[in-house]
Amino acid sequence: MKLRKGAKISIVGTGLVGASAAFAIMASGLASDLVLIDINKAKAEGEAMDLGDAAAFVKPLDVYAGSFEDCKDSDIIVFTAGANQKPGETRLDLVYKNVNILKESLPQLLKYCPYAIYLIVANPVDVLTHVALKISGLPSNQVFGSGTVLDTSRFRAELAEYCNVDPRNVHAYILGEHGDSEVAIWSTADVSGIPLKEFFQLRGIPPISREKVVKRVRNAAYEIIQLKGATYYAIAFTIKRICETVLRDENSILTVSGIVNDLYGIQDCCLSLPTIVNGAGREQVLPITLEREEEVALKNSAQILRDVIKQAGL
């Protein structure tokens, strides 16, 4: 699994998320070309200059502010452009603002980058991924969202802390909407192949409070926004991780958001499920077995997203 030679990544939107993602990508050495695009050209230029000053400390990289035309031949387009989520505002409240931004930008990107992988990050990510697929007409492997990859990381971190183990040894998923209706999948959660209940018994750990864990995971972004105004570091690492598995053709299983049909009774809706991600993008969804309550909750999450899409006339 080798890195594509001369990989090019373009980031549309250089707010806190886009700029932090640029930093994470640059530090990782994933790309040889990194293009920053923003409606505020001065902001993009400033971010590019600031990052460029660190050129002596990373692998050779050409980072610069540009236009949509400069995205030509990009391997990945990372779309973070959108209004910020304000305190007390849900991700779904952003739909009207950010759908319009996407509609204005995507046709111009497609003109120069018809073969790129499009990673949608701006919120509400599931709705915007749905819109991007409809507008672009591109195949579903080529357009997908960051989904619940970060939520899954939060879930695993919570379980790891409780179990006092390395988070990388915890396997558990958050599925559905990246937002308030997301679903924690407890039935398949394990620590290095040992089901949680058995692991608790082996280690003499009392049963975990599922409600408290789910609440912390679901409300993490709201709490951070309340404390510091925005979330951007963890999502930056999320973006870097997704780009990494694409550029290195890793066949990693990530809970990215993409179109779902004929699974769990869900039709024509973008949400997150365990998915093989590689050089082709979102290659294959893995339909894991869920308990009845989990499947019902997942269907409910899908219905909430469909209702938003319908209300917005999308």
Curated annotation (Swiss-Prot):
Record Gene3D superfamilies: Lactate dehydrogenase/glycoside hydrolase, family 4, C-terminal (3.90.110.10), NAD(P)-binding Rossmann-like Domain (3.40.50.720)
Give the Phosphotyrosine positions (modified residues).
Answer: 222
**GO annotation, cellular component aspect:** cytoplasm
Q: Name one GO molecular function term.
A: L-lactate dehydrogenase activity
Q: Where in the cell is it found?
A: Cytoplasm
Gene Ontology process terms (BP): glycolytic process; lactate metabolic process
Q: Which UniProt keywords apply?
A: Allosteric enzyme, Cytoplasm, NAD, Oxidoreductase, Phosphoprotein
Supply the EC number(s).
Answer: 1.1.1.27
Top-level taxon in the UniProt lineage = Bacteria
Pathway annotation: Fermentation; pyruvate fermentation to lactate; (S)-lactate from pyruvate: step 1/1
- Residue positions binding beta-D-fructose 1,6-bisphosphate: 156, 171
UniProt: NAD(+) binding residues: 17, 38, 43, 82-83, 121-123, 146
Question: Which residues are involved in binding substrate?
Answer: 85, 91, 123-126, 151-154, 231
Zinc among keywords: no
**Where are the active-site residues found?**
178 (proton acceptor)
> What sort of enzyme, by top EC class, is this?
oxidoreductase
Describe the reaction catalysed, as an equation.
(S)-lactate + NAD(+) = pyruvate + NADH + H(+)
> What influences the activity of this protein, per its activity regulation comment?
Allosterically activated by fructose 1,6-bisphosphate (FBP).
- HAMAP family per the UniProt record, alphabetical: Lactate_dehydrog
What does this chain do? Catalyzes the conversion of lactate to pyruvate.
**Subunit info?**
Homotetramer.
Q: Which family does it belong to?
A: Belongs to the LDH/MDH superfamily. LDH family.
What name does this protein carry? Answer: L-lactate dehydrogenase
- Which species does the entry assign this protein to? Desulforamulus reducens (strain ATCC BAA-1160 / DSM 100696 / MI-1)
